[in-house]
Amino acid sequence: MRGCLQSVKWLTSALRPSQSLASSTRYPRRLLSTSAPRNAQVRKPASEVEQRIAAIPIERFRNFCIVAHVDHGKSTLSDRLLELTGTIEAGANKQVLDKLDVERERGITVKAQTCSMLYNHQGEDYLLHLVDTPGHVDFRAEVSRSYASCGGALLLVDASQGIQAQTVANFYLAFAEGLKLVPVINKVDLPSADPQRALDQMKNTFELDPESAVLVSAKTGLNVSQLLPTVIEQIPAPVGDRTKPLRMLLVDSWYSTYKGVILLVRLFDGEIRAGDQVVSFATGLKYTVGEVGIMYPGQTAQSVLRAGQVGYIYFNPAMKRSQEAKVGDTYTKVGSERLVQPLPGFEEPKAMVFVAAYPVDASDFPHLEDSINQLILNDRSVTLQKESSEALGAGFRLGFLGTLHCSVFEDRLRQEHGASIIITPPTVPFKVIWKDGKEEIITNPALFPEEDTLRAKVTELQEPFVLATLTFPEEYLGRVIELCESNRGEQKSLEFFTSTQVILKYELPLAQLVDDFFGKLKGSTKGYASLDYEESGWRRSNISKLQLLVNKVPVDAVSRVVHSSQVQRLGRLWVSKFKEHVDRQMFEVVIQAAAGRNVVARESIKPFRKDVLQKLHAADVTRRKKLLEKQKEGRKKLKAVGNVVIEHKAFQAFLAK
């Protein structure tokens, strides 16, 4: 075995550096997989890179990220910057920092990715560290963590679309972190581009100087070369002292099959090398460092990481449990605990959307469990609980930050792990205030109190609300207000920030938001609207549990807590849709939707009818009555003791979007 490994090592070392680099960039690494590619180090001439980095003082470090709305060109601009600095080959790469299949398919960034770049400006080398952050509200935890490791940001706006909801939200996140913002207008090459409008919006909305803006086209590379000198001149260098005791912030982590948990870290003070012993302030656990390095663009080992740098480390022996890597934790060297003040951490993201996931085939449960656990190693914001359903068997209740987060996770389960799953519609948590003063948050509709308990022991029921910010052209204002009002919204503000664009703020129930509100909004505005939201607390609400009953027996997999205004509509929809997928039986099947004790909708499936009168003489009336009566009694008995057989595919079809 050792001989095999040595021969592989000999083969890889025999490759010319240019060959190795070309192959690694032509087939970009999927850095978030738990398989080998993330662990494979990029074979660059490390000594040359390391010598250049060693000669650069902290005053010539720049840590920056790109702040933008979804689809405004962050990942494409990142590619151009990596090409410009020679980190990757020009033209051979598409979205180098978007590693996941789902990111490339949807054109979105899900995980924050990082890369170090070396750039010579006016005869001096600079070490630039770029973070490509997600733009969507569901991945805000990724965004805020990334900002903590940066000193400035490029505020990117699409010249054809102008400022959008998530541009505003991400601007305020970056502003709150104290980042220096450089305005950049992208896609100026488009026929529909209006750079002046975008500059005016930046000035009016964010009070940014239009004179300092850089107008670029990330796709064609136009003016991109002006960006890096602007970054160097306008974004401040990180502050740190390499002679002080180590103070290191954990920004992110991912799991490797071979190396255990790998940590992405930002050094504020001191330096770290392989062999150093470090201790976590959050857990008190001690580790020996196995390797340190930078992302260039893959893992590139270094002999040392210094104050001001962002890089990766892993331990030897390995950190095996990803739960030990608490994002926002501070590490220092063993013996320096009393000399170092821990850095302020990050707020843990709270799951706000819940679904149940079941395998289509019950025998696939172990595979599904293994697949979910592997994905959760790289996404700690997902919550996981085992649950069981009489109808669908063993499964899991999963909690997500939002509906896109949920949808991306589902896509990754199917694409990366080949999972065949049934996913229930998304639900939101509800708060129960009991008469004895206790409060309980319920995330599973099956655990919602029954009617008798509600009347006897519950004081109040509450549901979560969000403050939604919607931006869209003025011509769609009437339709959008109508949509928000029909979804139990309450208008908070209306603002015209250009002659044609509107910013509308509404408080909406989260339950309405996850019920395809964004899809309806896009339909009402022909795709021109954007949406961002933040939590707005809990409010008293008239809610009840809606259940589906088959022959008066509740189907546990299909229950939902809804507002009283939605009960009738949803109940009728459920029974008519479920009827389409249930096969006829030897007895009548009654499908009902019930809220508490009230049946709000009903459908019946007629039984198969055996002709018991086939052999009778037409005149034999008494015999005819007797046989029909007997058949009727037999059906009653069968209905009383018989179980309705509902195929798995019926649930699959019913729960399908």
From Swiss-Prot:
Keyword Transcription: no
Disulphide bridges, residue numbers: none
Record-linked Gene3D superfamilies: 3.30.70.240, Elongation factor 4, C-terminal domain, Elongation Factor G (Translational Gtpase), domain 3, P-loop containing nucleotide triphosphate hydrolases, Translation factors
EC number: 3.6.5.-
Catalytic activity: GTP + H2O = GDP + phosphate + H(+)
Residues given in the record as GTP binding sites: 68-75, 132-136, 186-189
Membrane topology: Peripheral membrane protein
Transit peptide start-stop: 1-39
Listed Pfam families: EFG_C, GTP_EFTU, LepA_C
CDD domains: EF4_II, EF4_III, LepA, lepA_C
Principal location: mitochondrion
tr-type G domain ranges (all copies): 59-239
Family classification: Belongs to the TRAFAC class translation factor GTPase superfamily. Classic translation factor GTPase family. LepA subfamily.
Protein name as it appears in the record: Translation factor GUF1, mitochondrial
Organism of origin: Ajellomyces capsulatus (strain G186AR / H82 / ATCC MYA-2454 / RMSCC 2432)
